Amino acid sequence: MATNPVEAKPTAPIVNDDLERITHLKPQVDPASISWRNLRRDAFWQRIPAWQDVDEETFLDHKWQEKNAITSPAKLVKTVQELVGSDFIADVEAGFAAAPMAVRISPYVLALIDWETPYADGLRRQFLPLGSQIESDHPMLTLDSLGEQADAPVPGLTHRYPDKALFLVLDTCPVYCRFCTRSYAVGLDTEEVEKVQLKATRARWDRAFKYMSERVELEDVVISGGDAYRLKADQIREIGNRLLDIPHIRRFRFATKGPAIMPMKVLTDHDWLDALTEVVDRGRSMGKEVALHTHFNHPNEVTGISQDAMGVLFERGITVRNQSVFQRGVNDHPDTMVELSKRLSHINVHPYYVYIHDLVRGTEDLRTTVARGVQVEKRLRGATAGFNTPTFVVDAPGGGGKR
């Protein structure tokens, strides 16, 4: 009887124990080169002359951060004039005179700016406009470039997608970003923009809750503004519980830039954190998801303080996702975006979206081409796990939605 030739040949071992013969064995990596794990824990704020005597306990107090926020060009000048020349100061003053957003910067952010190279710094570009860098606005620009108000059945509630609503609960933030899509409503009036009023009033909220309760197709709600960091603890509970009590609402998220620009609030505002935790826990018991969405844009925004704050949220079972804005000179280089995504993953923040910069007045110097976004996304894919790789999207002008 003939022997089956396949059975006659012994199978070569799949695993080769001789590591020297494995062609693609990766070399050992110097731990110091894994930069996304090296989060600064120094007293970086003491480089600012005005805060050189501020101790760690004081700096980590969210009330101190709020009290000492930079809220005017004059206050900014007083704080940084020893670090920069008069030409830079004049440039900033010219920038704010032409900007659609009021001035508000937390000490945490201001201290993270590299004041040796402020013109090129990725954090400075997001928060401090320079007159010398402002470019002519895009010809298709409108103040509400995404058409949010056109899809608002009641003031401050946008219902664009079939099963999702955007609830703008208030119109203030702990900082004001240059690139804010809602510069038509957020913050104080400026020389350039008279704002739409979206105050946190009972009457306006009631109209929004009534609409959402009557639209049975709604399952997903984004609570934004403004910024949910500015909600009081009882407001967090009220909004959360009223949404949880609507049977067809299955999930919602509080949107806040807070963890990126004032992470110490999570560590020291116990009432706010407890209120958020209560809503998340109640939602989980009902089979509903409540999450926190935040907005880190540059690796330098992620510090040891960020890690401590996100660690507290992680321990409490609160999911945190990140939505970045793709900006020229901030995060439009592949290496920067890889570093950002890995740092976020390292502190248990899920990189979720990267938005191509919207049409916003006074920010053409920050906008990139869509093609540049495609290039960076291609480089980012494969650099880390797929579930830690953000999706790049364009929110089309005029109300077209995400693409």
In which residue ranges do the predicted regions lie?
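Flexible, acidic/Gly-rich N-terminal and inter-domain linker regions that tether
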Residues: 1-160
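C-terminal accessory regions of radical SAM enzymes
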Residues: 375-403
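Iron-sulfur (Fe-S) cluster-binding segments and ferredoxin-like electron-carrier domains
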Residues: 180-193
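N-terminal pre-triad scaffold of radical SAM enzymes
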Residues: 105, 150-183
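Conserved AdoMet/S-adenosylmethionine-binding subsite of the radical SAM
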Residues: 202-220, 229-384
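Conserved, mostly hydrophobic/aromatic
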Residues: 109, 177, 352
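Short cysteine/histidine-rich metal-coordination sites, predominantly Zn2+-binding motifs
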Residues: 193-201
